[in-house]
């Protein structure tokens, strides 16, 4: 398994997702650069200890070539390398590289990509690899990275990337072109909507996890949507641990997608057929498809409310009169 991740601005490169139960997301935390890679390595160590660590060839692969990471901040690269080494990855394969430029020639190379690219950024066309612009001519980094991930994956490779909500419903030609590319020419599997605040205090934007497999020949059928409300931490700047995390439920449901067809659109997760997504202009925002049940509120008759108000006025008047009498004594 090979995994690529790229840091962003310093304020965002401290955010990552942990691995759990063959699913890309366990919980949000702040771990420093290479957090994705470290979490993936820890997961493999827990689940495939004998297969990897008792096999010399596989252990060498684990230590040197299994994981790949790029960043444009040398300080973050040093911290990332140190993080990986302290977690048992002896020779971290991370490098100083501008992932979106012609400098990055990786194509059809990786089986897994986990990424938390910059939420907002704009580049000059001259600084972007020309093959990325062929899919969609855009300067927005959050869009360019999705195109890059498709290029870097092997056929059959899988990507889980955090994206700002705007990527899912943006109306520009570039937004639509990228969503169409993923839905029509590859296999879109899941959209996991996350609450605003999961990246505080670094960023307060609403985000989601998009999961897709590179096929080059379509394959999207039903897309799974999940509305995460609780990631196990408060949504303020302190991000303190709280009970009721949705993460275990996400993992369990994702592993049993066959059961999700029974769920209604009013529930926390549900499936949406490809045809409906196409009909909605490839809009991938969960609010486009989730149905909200409005409970009709019943209120007292206006005359009852007026009677109650008069009673309160009477009590207030009586109280004021009593207070005035006490003050006159």
Placement of each model-derived feature along the sequence:
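A conserved structural/catalytic subdomain of Rossmann-like adenosyl-cofactor enzymes
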Residues: 101-329
